[in-house]
Amino acid sequence: MNKFDEFIESNEKDLDVDTSTRNSIISMSPVRKTGRKIRSASSNGYRLEHHRTSSAGSMHSQRLMTPTRLNDQDHPLQAKPDARRVVTRHSSVSVPNAMSKRRSLIQPMVVPTTPESQNNLPSVSHSEGSYGIPLESTTVLSSEQAMASGLRRSRNGSSQSVNSMIATTIPTNGVDVSALLQSLATKELELLECKQKIEDLKKQTQHEEQNYTRRARELHELKEQVSKHLDPSLNTPVKNRAFSPVYQNIPLESRTENAGNSSLPSSVSKPKNMGHQSTNQSRSVSPQDIQERRQRDDSSDSSKQSLWSKPLALFNQFDKIIQHEIERTLNWDDSLSGTPEVQEGTPTSNSESSAQQYDNEAPGARQKSPSQGSVSRSLWSFVSDVKAGLLGIEEENDNDVITDNRCDPVYKSDRQHEQKKSTHKITNRGQAEDSGDDSSLNTRKFKTTTKFQKDNAGNNSLTDESGHRTREKKK
């Protein structure tokens, strides 16, 4: 016996309490009093943690209640039919007195509870069973009745302690916590559902916007296809359309009206009115009129040559006009060195020779249709208007004509004779253009008297200006 066991036994004697018999089960047989064999942990499922010998020399064991396996047969409180279990004591205290002392040690501090709490929790005391009671607070009696009574008392004490704990957690205002928790969970679920619905609506909105943009793009493409089918000009290449904006804006009515006014004096005397009229007519043209005009042109004779097949010839004419004006401006003193009679006689003969040349080059020009001739004449009248606008001498021409009428009537009569010749020449030139002969247009002549007089006959304003300046120099 060591000092620790002696100290424990001395304290037990002083307190009149025997603690060495707790959780110890021995047989009452005198043969096995000192030599009882303890079962191993593998047989009953419990581990032995500590062994000590009491004052009487008997071996006792403290067992830790951590079962390795759950089995009803190995339960420590189960009664054995072949053995009678009693509490071993080493003192002279009787068994009832020891039981009363042990009950006083295991009774808990009980808080007074209401009858309602005891009625609401009847299953707590019954559900505890033998597993809810600590093994240290139970005592194995010598009979089955003593063990049952001890268990009943321990159950009542534990149920009272549990009831006291639950009574303290119940709120005093009468509101059920479970109902509050249930409502809280319901609200959280509703919020989650609302959030999910919002996200779904956002995704659906984005999808609808994408569908809208796609359908709008398809509608725009269909509109372009329909416009291309209705207006064939949109299908023509840009190269062919770049040379025809000026003539496309002139309707057929304006061309027929300009056909009768193709003479040079009318084009010189009314350049401003013609410019305004052509501008207004070009602004009033609508796409429907252009489409109707193209349909009429397509329905006409297929053998007739189109005017738009010669855009380079038209630009060649403009190039020659501009080149001639530049040469005339640079060589102004040379052209004014001679007398007016010589200057006026030369253009007459040159104009006659040029008219004969155009007649010889275009023998079958008069056999063309009148509509084509009117179109060509209107085109040449438009060219003369553009040239007059480029020169910018309309106002000076009006003043020069008035001064010439007052100073030199003889020169005026000669000029009228020259205008008649130039009118005949322009008519022949229009017929030559209708015939499609461009031999005279492809030849470029620089600083020749024939070219100079031919262009002077085509524009009366240039002749008036040259004559007026010649007389000023002679004075």
Swiss-Prot record:
Keyword Coiled coil carried by entry: yes
Extent of the signal sequence: none
Cellular component terms (Gene Ontology): cytoplasm
Chain positions covered by the region annotation Disordered: 32-62, 252-306, 332-377, 400-475
Residues with PTM Phosphothreonine: T236
Bias-annotated ranges (Basic and acidic residues): 290-301, 403-421
Residues forming coiled coils: 179-231
Lineage: Eukaryota, Fungi, Dikarya, Ascomycota, Saccharomycotina
The organism's place on the tree of life at top rank: Eukaryota
Compositionally biased tracts (Polar residues): 257-287, 332-359, 368-377
Source organism of the structure: Saccharomyces cerevisiae (strain Lalvin QA23)
Modified residues (Phosphoserine): S244, S286
Keyword Cytoplasm tagged: yes
Family to which this protein belongs: Belongs to the TDA11 family.
Protein name: Topoisomerase I damage affected protein 11
Locations listed in the record: Cytoplasm
Ranges annotated as spanning the membrane: none
Entry keyword set: Coiled coil, Cytoplasm, Phosphoprotein
